[in-house]
């Protein structure tokens, strides 16, 4: 008889839905270790605007995959899958259960379904692309990408050299476009996954939470946090880090494109739009159990019962 696959828990949900609070309570009840699934929490020096767990929360429930990139660096779904699989294996080796918590749905999808077989990076090919960029400019290379792979060309900004370089590198190594290769399915996740999504039943409650959270961020020094990033001089609004909701709007304020009240208003609106996209993803998600943010005890009981009954 084959050995059963190890358990894992996905705790998904829109921003400001109470994922972190529930995850901390779950760690008190179950032998779990937390892995962050959030494309904003990976960045160092971006704590307030991302609502990164604070020292008290991390002391109660340490999170893996926080603060692993500088804001000038990119981080792909493939990078996440590699890192998450390693952390999950380490947690299982310790006799515990991986609890993946966050709202970056693309990361969950990559982890659950696997990724396309993209070629490994080739330093020589990458160096050749860098030389061309220095001679002709990234906009010239972006035009080349649009010709060979219109879908990727439309998705990748000319001022995002890391992603632009990778798309060209993939084509030059494999002879196939990034769009072609990403249609090929990868290896599925070798775990028994219990999937949960937490959100308030009333959308108005979520909107209120988002607005209150943004106000608290401003009070906690969000403007000063973004100003420190702005003054570095090596960051720009086309980087994935600065495109994070809240940061892009505050960046516009610091650049003189709007006043602070307008930046806050835009930030709240952008966060609401993010939550709407996350909920849309989740509504189409298979094998998902919904939890109500307004009934934390029931949510806790639902998850713990599911895990304890699956032995």
UniProtKB/Swiss-Prot annotation:
Pfam short name (any one): IPPT
Protein name (Swiss-Prot/TrEMBL): tRNA dimethylallyltransferase
Function field: Catalyzes the transfer of a dimethylallyl group onto the adenine at position 37 in tRNAs that read codons beginning with uridine, leading to the formation of N6-(dimethylallyl)adenosine (i(6)A).
NCBIfam families xref list: miaA
Site (Interaction with substrate tRNA): 104, 126
Catalytic activity, reaction form: adenosine(37) in tRNA + dimethylallyl diphosphate = N(6)-dimethylallyladenosine(37) in tRNA + diphosphate
Record-listed E.C. numbers: 2.5.1.75
The keyword tRNA processing is assigned to this record: yes
Binding positions for substrate per the UniProt entry: 15-20
Cofactor: Mg(2+)
UniProt cross-references to InterPro entries, sorted A to Z: Dimethylallyltransferase, IPT, P-loop_NTPase
Region (Interaction with substrate tRNA): 38-41, 162-166, 243-248, 276-283
Gene3D superfamilies, sorted: 1.10.20.140, P-loop containing nucleotide triphosphate hydrolases
A GO molecular-function descriptor: ATP binding
GO biological process, one term: tRNA modification
Keywords tagged on the record: ATP-binding, Magnesium, Nucleotide-binding, Transferase, tRNA processing
Assembly information from the UniProt record: Monomer.
Family statement: Belongs to the IPP transferase family.
Residues holding ATP: 13-20
């Amino acid at each position: 008889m084959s050995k059963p696959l190890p358990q894992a828990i996905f705790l998904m949900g829109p921003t400001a839905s109470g994922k972190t609070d529930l995850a901390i309570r779950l760690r008190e009840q179950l032998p779990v270790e937390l892995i962050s699934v959030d494309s904003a929490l990976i960045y160092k020096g971006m704590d307030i605007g991302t609502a990164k767990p604070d020292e008290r929360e991390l002391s109660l429930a340490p999170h893996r995959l926080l603060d692993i990139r500088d804001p000038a660096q990119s981080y792909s779904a493939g990078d996440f899958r590699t890192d998450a699989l390693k952390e999950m294996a380490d947690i299982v080796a310790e006799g515990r259960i991986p609890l993946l918590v966050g709202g970056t749905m693309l990361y969950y999808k990559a982890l659950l379904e696997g990724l396309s077989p993209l070629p490994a990076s080739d330093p020589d090919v990458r160096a050749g692309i860098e030389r061309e960029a220095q001679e002709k400019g990234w906009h010239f290379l972006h035009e080349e990408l649009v010709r060979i792979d219109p879908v990727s060309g439309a998705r990748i900004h000319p001022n995002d050299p890391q992603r632009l370089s990778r798309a060209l590198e993939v084509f030059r190594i494999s002879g196939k476009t990034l769009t072609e290769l990403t249609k090929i399915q990868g290896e599925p996740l070798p775990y028994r996954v219990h999937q949960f999504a937490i959100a308030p039943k009333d959308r108005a409650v979520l909107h209120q939470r988002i607005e209150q959270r943004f106000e608290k961020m401003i009070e906690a020094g969000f403007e000063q946090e973004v100003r420190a990033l702005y003054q570095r001089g090596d960051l720009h609004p086309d980087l994935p880090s600065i495109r994070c909701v809240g940061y892009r709007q505050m960046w516009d304020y610091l650049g003189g494109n709007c006043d602070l009240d307008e930046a806050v208003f835009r930030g709240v609106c952008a966060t609401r739009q993010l939550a709407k996209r996350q909920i849309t993803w989740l509504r189409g998600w298979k094998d998902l159990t919904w939890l109500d943010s307004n009934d934390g005890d029931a949510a806790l009981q639902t998850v713990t019962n599911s895990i304890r009954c699956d032995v």
